């Protein structure tokens, strides 16, 4: 069980709204960061076959869904101290054989993207809130 405060939840929620304000731009930041660190990740996402295209609705849709899952995980942590992931989500990640280092690359890209979205509102406290929510979601996906 993880202690996640009201303030941490509010930090994640407000910065998620900053991300949503320009999903095409921040989707490019996110997926470009992933591919810079792990070019082979391109094979895990069918919508990256032709590179990072901000006009591709699958690219922006997947980014929004992932960031929303982390935001929802923050809410679950605040409410119950645990995150429960959908079994289908776990199954997809297992089928694609997503590794722990790949989860780390995604976390780093997520943090870089949120930092870009919030600008000078970025702080260690904000970073930590996203890290905890993401780490707990990743753990739940691996168990699902």
Swiss-Prot record:
Pfam families (UniProt xref): Globin
Gene Ontology annotations for the cellular component aspect, listed alphabetically: cytosol; nucleus
Tissue spec: Specifically expressed in root nodules.
Gene3D superfamilies: Globins (1.10.490.10)
Compartments where located: Cytoplasm, Cytosol; Nucleus
Region forming the signal peptide: none
GO molecular function, one term: metal ion binding
Source superkingdom: Eukaryota
The entry's keywords: Acetylation, Cytoplasm, Heme, Iron, Metal-binding, Nitration, Nitrogen fixation, Nodulation, Nucleus, Oxygen transport, Phosphoprotein, Transport
Residues recorded as bearing N-acetylvaline in the entry: 2
Family membership: Belongs to the plant globin family.
Assembly mode: Monomer.
Protein name as catalogued: Leghemoglobin 3
Encoding gene, per UniProt annotation: LB3
